Amino acid sequence: MAEKPKLHYFNARGRMESTRWLLAAAGVEFEEKFIKSAEDLDKLRNDGYLMFQQVPMVEIDGMKLVQTRAILNYIASKYNLYGKDIKERALIDMYIEGIADLGEMILLLPVCPPEEKDAKLALIKEKIKNRYFPAFEKVLKSHGQDYLVGNKLSRADIHLVELLYYVEELDSSLISSFPLLKALKTRISNLPTVKKFLQPGSPRKPPMDEKSLEEARKIFRF
């Protein structure tokens, strides 16, 4: 029996949460090896486990994969969540790059200087309402199907629904004008594998708080 994937990161969302979501949605059990100190990170580096000296790192199928996009691409390909042909894959890539752009803004919000946080949050909300959510609502409306690409579950649906949960944490009213996105969120959330991941006690991580931010500062020395 194949070994479970091993996820090396600290105990927070950060740049590993999308991998947790994708594996969970695919029904794949995984182990987490939490980095708890700067010394833990140094050991991974010194042992030659981190090609570019940084995490996330996932041990899977005899490889030690780094770089978030490479990790997600491999998992999506392995578990048939990356479209049926090159055209579908191109659409999926286009959608997830947009998702990643908005996700990066939300990811970096906790480390934003306090005096800039209100302006940054206002900018994020503006882009959600006027750029990103209308674009994805239009995709769903244009083909009238249940999923973003090919009327079949893909990584694009999973990454988008993960993002919808983050947006809901910022301001639950932001999705109210986008009924097809709301329906997609409900549909994906009710898939048995995703439903399990959304339950308390799963590997899903809570929003970044001051404690986990301080832990990150110590581990990554920033």
UniProtKB/Swiss-Prot annotation:
It is found in: Cytoplasm. Its EC number is 2.5.1.18, 1.11.1.-, 5.3.3.-. The isomerase activity is inhibited by S-methylglutathione (GSMe). The modification N6-succinyllysine is found at residue 4. Its main location: cytoplasm. It comes from the Eukaryota. Changing residue 71 to A/V: No significant effect on enzyme activity. Reduces protein stability. Changing residue 216 to H: Confers ability to hydrolyze S-glutathionyl benzoate to glutathione and benzoic acid. It holds the Pfam family GST_N. Residues 85-207 form the GST C-terminal domain. Keywords: Acetylation, Cytoplasm, Isomerase, Lipid metabolism, Oxidoreductase, Peroxidase, Transferase. GO terms for molecular function: fatty acid binding; glutathione peroxidase activity; glutathione transferase activity; steroid Delta-isomerase activity. One of its GO terms (biological process) is linoleic acid metabolic process. Disulfide bonds: none annotated. Homodimer or heterodimer of GSTA1 and GSTA2. The C-terminal domain may form a component of the hydrophobic substrate-binding site, but in contrast appears not to be directly involved in GSH binding and is not absolutely essential for catalytic activity. Belongs to the GST superfamily. Alpha family. This is Glutathione S-transferase A1.
